Amino acid sequence: MITLKEALKYSKEELENLKKELNEKAKKEKKLGAYIEQFLDKDLSVSGEGVPVAIKDNISVKGWELTSASKILQGYIAPYDASAIVNLKANGFAPFGRCNMDEFAMGSSTASSCYGKTLNPLNFERVPGGSSGGSAAAVAGGLALASLGSDTGGSVRQPAAFCGCVGFKPSYGRVSRYGLASYSSSLDQIGVLTQNVEDAAILYDAIAGYDKMDSTSANIEFIKTAPNLNANEKLKIAVIENYVNDADTEVKNALLKTIDMLKANGHEIVYKNLLDSKFDIAAYYIIATAEASANLSRYDGVRYGKRSENIQNLKEMYVNTRSEGFGEEVKRRILLGTFVLSSGYYDAYYIKAQKARAFIKAKYEEILQDCDLIFMPVTPTMAFKFDTQKSPMQTYLEDVYTISVNLAGLGGISVPVAKDKEGLNISAQLICKAYDEQTLLDGALSLEQMIKN
């Protein structure tokens, strides 16, 4: 598969041929389930001219159906382009194909989609991760040059690690959320999934920047990263020792070898510890579900999306529409969020979680005052099998090493570093100071080149 960098040099005719080739591949690989539209006998949606980039089903593209992989939004046509899509088109790219996802971005396996599950291109018995599993599977499976996803607690980095591609979540506010279907407004961030680090920088440069349409957009200077990439920069990297040691044996061993390579290549390695990850899990799921319960209250059968036909009055319309339209995981999180915001529990849970969030952020900032980057696992395990019986709590633990990055509002990237004997991917995660994506991408490029060599 050609890279984004190479495709940007293509003529208009060559790009049209590339899109036809990707269409044919997508139709042949329907079983993978990376694209939502691939179960239909028609071409993938395309919007505008340019290098094709696959788009997650929660990012608005004018004229395209946007469902967040939920029955409740089926039939809703986006009336405008998300700001990230506007920027994408302005920089020579074209939205191309809707990628499958966990319903409303709530999940770690892309198994909760109303369209059916997505498979891992490395092993069809394994999950691709989530919630941007379709975006990761499309890139890793050779059905897309690159894709856009969203990352609320690891939803770009974790599927990238499971499928074996690069997943990059910028700092909170660096890419506009205008036009992104909200899950948790203080945590959501659009990110990129690509074949390599340089492509991640190119695609990030195309979508990043201040946007007056998003009140949480960071109004600070943005300098393009791709032209300034430097893999030779020697960095001080903090290894989170307790997280590396707590990972499964194969993941731990691969990361220890990677740390040795970083040392051998002239990077300064120091060892630090972060809080027990159980605090991250508790704070994240209280804050995320509380915000989700408010954000998803708009789906009531009145304004847009599906409306239940089994109704006698207004109350039944609300109750039946939401009961029929939402999947089990979404209902679970709405109920949890409503509970923690209810009278008598708000102070006990929500306020306490916000205090824990501030403490988590302060701990990251303390380490990054003295270091350029942080190094730790993306996930504690490799991609698990679909038939693995996991409780909701066990599934939530798949994001144990990624959610704190969102709580702190920092940038993070997942870079493949090893394969196990079955060919499953193992990735390392690098984390930067807020808005220091240049250093993050420099470090990631250095790591990538080390592994390739």
From Swiss-Prot:
SUPFAM superfamilies: Amidase signature (AS) enzymes
Active site: K56, S131, S155
Keywords assigned by UniProt, alphabetized: ATP-binding, Ligase, Nucleotide-binding, Protein biosynthesis
Enzyme superclass (EC): ligase
Any Pfam family matching the protein: Amidase
Molecular-function annotations in GO: ATP binding; glutaminyl-tRNA synthase (glutamine-hydrolyzing) activity
Gene Ontology CC terms: glutamyl-tRNA(Gln) amidotransferase complex
GO biological process terms held by the UniProt record: translation
Function according to Swiss-Prot or TrEMBL: Allows the formation of correctly charged Gln-tRNA(Gln) through the transamidation of misacylated Glu-tRNA(Gln) in organisms which lack glutaminyl-tRNA synthetase. The reaction takes place in the presence of glutamine and ATP through an activated gamma-phospho-Glu-tRNA(Gln).
Name of the protein described by the UniProt record: Glutamyl-tRNA(Gln) amidotransferase subunit A
Lineage of origin: Bacteria, Pseudomonadati, Campylobacterota, Epsilonproteobacteria, Campylobacterales
Gene label: gatA
